[in-house]
Amino acid sequence: MVDGLIVLAHGVLGFGNPLGLPSLVNYFNGVEEHLRQEGHQVFSPQVNPFGSIAQRGAELASAISRVLADGQKTHIIAHSMGGLDARYALVNVPGFVDRVATLVTIGTPHRGSPVADAIVNNTALSAQLPSFLTEQLQRNAGALHDLTTDSCAHFNQTTVESSAIRRIAVPGDASQGGHELILFQVAALIGQLTGEVNDGVVTAGSALREGYTHLDPWPADHAGEIGWSLHSFFPAQLTQRFLPPPTHLAWYDQIVAML
């Protein structure tokens, strides 16, 4: 069992489970329950789904600090924007860095996201995105602006991380994910435009960061990294015949074994 609290930090448009209640829908699909069954202490805080990195990072640090026992440390497993939130908190929230042992970022746009750039600049790529995603981000500009390439470049210059914390970065490779992907069309277009492996939202070059231990790309798109694929929307008796079984829980077990 991991020594310390495992925190699952959600990305933009995401949600937590701060009370730890059973739920039919979780941002990290089935991960919290799976880790609890293995005996780990898990916390899924809620931050503003549309907020800026600064707002979300402060909320993340506050939520974690409220539940940590005296002397206890935490291991943050963050998806997408959640990784930027955690980085902000570690640098800017007084004393928070002393309570964190590990930061794992999964599909985090450390150098920005081509999807955010596309929505801001209204390029052809934005037309390939789900309408609910573009509409929500356009209405809530805090998160959208902070995820652009230019904004993340500034964030990286002003956010100097502590080398005392173990840091792990995981990219996604939608091209290896098979036909159960949700974002396969977007991932293919990003690959054509950038020439990079990507998960349909974040390129591998952006998901990896200097000073972090780099894991091999997960064969999934951005949604699949947290367990959401076509499996999630059809009865098991159908998907088990036509789609490969979901494997994301094993990926999280791999991470937890490193903590």
Feature-to-residue mapping (PLM):
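Glycine-rich, phosphate-binding/catalytic loops in enzymes
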Residues: 23-26, 92-95, 120-122, 186, ...
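Serine-dependent carboxylesterase/thioesterase catalytic core
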Residues: 10, 42, 54-159, 199
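Short, solvent-exposed loop/turn segments at secondary-structure junctions
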Residues: 12-14, 48-50, 83, 109-111, ...
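Short aromatic-enriched loop/helix-cap "lid" or pocket-rim segments at secondary-structure transitions
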Residues: 19-21, 113-119, 124, 178-183
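Active-site catalytic motif of lipid deacylating hydrolases and related acyltransferases
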Residues: 1-74
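A structural micro-motif
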Residues: 4, 40, 72, 98-101, ...
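Hydrophobic/aromatic beta-strand patches that form the interior of the parallel beta-sheet core
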Residues: 7, 43, 104, 168-170, ...
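C-terminal catalytic-base region of ester-bond hydrolases, centering on the histidine
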Residues: 162-259
